[in-house]
Amino acid sequence: MEVQRAQVGSERNARAGPKVPAWMGGQRYGGRTGVLLCTHFPSSMSDFAAFGAPDTTDFASTRVATAAAAAAAAFTAPASVPASALAADPELLRRAYRLMHTAAAMATLYEEEKTVAARYVHATARGHEAVQLAAAFLLTENDYAAPYYRDDAMLLGMGLRPFELMLQLLAKADDPFSGGRTYYSHPSLRRPGFPIIPHQSSATGMQAIPATGMAHALAYFESQALAVPGNEESRMRNEELEGGKHSQSSLPVSASKPVVLCSIGDGAMTEGEVAEALQMAILHQLPIVYLVQDNDWGISATGREMRAMNAYEFAAGFPGLRRLQVNGADFGSSHAGLTEAFAHVRSRRGPVLVHAKCPLLGHHTSGVRREWYRSDLATHQEQDPLPRLHQQLLAAGVSVEELAALAAKAQATVRDDWAEALAAPNPDPATFANHEFAPPAVTAEAGERRPAGAEKTLMVDAALHAVDDILRDFPEALFYGQDVGGELGGVFREAALLAKKYGDARVFNTPIQEAYIVGSTAGMAAVGARPIVEIQFADYIWPALNQLVEELSKSCYLTMGKFPIPALIRVPIGAYGGGGPYHSGSIESTLLTIRGIKVVYPSNAADMKGLMRAAFLDPNPVIMLEHKGLYWSKVPGTEDAKTFEPATGYVVPLGQAAIAQAADADKLRRGETALVVTYGMGVHWAKTASRDFPGQIEILDLRTLNPLDFEAVTAATRRHGKVLVLTEEPLMNSFAESLAGRIQRHCFEVLDGPVFTLGAANLPAIALNVELERQMLPSAAKVAAALGELLAY
């Protein structure tokens, strides 16, 4: 194939913005950036055979050139759709053509203006425009989408203005997605007339699980004959959108069943979390299209370096997953294949994977430039979807003049929008902390804590009854995790009989997939479901941290409050005598380093029931740590964990500590008292230890670790002047040590001694042997010794 380099334009012309390409009678795209353009337009994918002859003229690295050539040789896809088939909908083709020019002009402009545009890292769709637009055109306002960071053309296809995308590129205050808080082409959108797009992170493959969670929520609502929340409102197109700044969608109004589109790159397909998502989509036959855009590059690694098979071949290992291949560089092929995929999912309600081969014409990102390592640019350039569509439109009878006018209009829009975006205001620094959390639903204790006729109940039963009440009262609620469904109802019987009562669609087992269990809640919540999930043991939460950190914790903040995630995550925790190194751990300090989540840790049955319901009602992700040693009150000294059971509907607000034991008023006046600040099992160790010091010990039960009731802590500290912070965790670098430091700083003038701390030994695991476990952990005797020393100080 004949390949030429774009001519370097004058400085004046470069600043003027993108020009009409040479094949339309004007200058080539690229300006001073030197973008390669082909003068021969392949008519079918047989031309991809030439993808094995990279131009290495400007690249010195033989190793990189060899790898690139190997990648190019593997670049194959199905044949293009004939021009005669495309002619059936010329308006669709014109729209695709105009938006391809828009996306290409934006990419070129960003290069020409890189001093400004590359201040913040970004990636563009160059080479992927055809398949992205084809997908966007098939979405309706009832649908849900999870794009990835190279999908700016897809966003244009949904109807977003270049101006809106540029606001995010420049991190401006009016960025409609994040208000300047996250990267270009990281959308979050909840706007009438558009698909719903929840928070999107940069971590590769992260979107697969939340997207599958969205599909799971849709399937759940359908199984219960419930309306999907928000779909009725989404059809109200006449609502004024933010003073007219933002675009109206060009998507069709549709009463068809909603679907989810998950867009993902080929490099991300090797992530283990993607396999978890596919497993669940097939197990539950969820309505989702996985669109894999395969350009054979993962930054500088080629496909042959990073995978044993492509996505289409990988999908063959998942029976029940329909798979299709399209030529992602050809709009007709992409639209035909995706039309089939969407139709299947809308009617059959099962998952489809579409594998689209695409050339990568731009940089990986503005910070990792193609010329540093790629020698296959010429061969990729030969598959540019824009000149291909140009030729197909000519063959369909559209005139050169009309195409030139469409291109010129697109480029003028890009230039005008760029000027408007540059002039837009930056965020007000005073707003930097807004939207860490959505406002809580419960702000005060409500309901009867000890109703007439109440009997004492175990913590495990209080938890069970709380979830039972929630499932009865809230049809959007569902409960899932390992072993919570079916006959068992949880390894601690904390979900006993719930599956039988509410059905397998609402209470069900999952595979051993902690990442899915947690990450799916982000998608569930975006659709309007209210998930309660369980990690079977705290020791096994670690695979879920990726989703917890990147998706759940950041969503509310980075979407400016549009997508808080109301998810209740139950985690049995703590040692209970012989549980050993993988069933006894305490993890609260790790969780408390994650901003944007709330952490609750009850010590008795009444608080368990009240906090469980409040946590469910909270519009933010809440982790409920439930001590296994307190579930049954079988551990000596934990009898007080049994309490009278509160009435249905009882709530305890998150972030409110409670005095579990007060000191004697006379001893308090004489300065003979001390304060224990603790939670969970620590409350019971402290109660037992305090018997050695009658009337001298106040115990403050934190109940919620984040948000922390530090006001209650400081008030109690000022009453006593002597403080012990008690935890079950290893003490070094723990939450307890941090809290002790805060008390020391804020209450220094009223302290009568150093703030004491007590926790487990600083060891990596809890030993299986119960005698070794006792040596490692705090106990009532150890607490009593510490209190004796503190009181005598």
What are the residue ranges of the model-derived segments?
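Short, basic, low-complexity termini and linkers enriched in Ser/Thr/Gly/Pro
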Residues: Q4-V8, G25-S44, Q224-S256
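Conserved acidic/glycine
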Residues: S44-V131, F137, V228, A356-Y502, ...
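Cofactor-binding active-site loop characterized by glycine-rich and histidine/acidic residues
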Residues: A105-T108, E112-P229, P252-H284, T302-P319, ...
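Glycine/charged-rich beta-loop-alpha catalytic/anionic-binding loops adjacent to active sites
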Residues: E112-A117, T182-S201, P258-L261, D296, ...
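A short, small-residue-rich loop immediately preceding and capping a beta-strand
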Residues: A118-H122, A145-P147, H199-Q200, A227, ...
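Active-site nucleophile and cofactor-binding loops and adjacent substrate-binding regions
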Residues: Y120-H128, Y149-R150, P187-A208, V326-F331, ...
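A glycine-rich helix N-cap at a beta->alpha junction
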Residues: A171-F177, I282-L291, V507-N509, S553-V571
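Glycine-rich ThDP/TPP pyrophosphate-binding loop and its adjacent helix/strand module
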Residues: H199, G205-L226, S256-R415, A423, ...
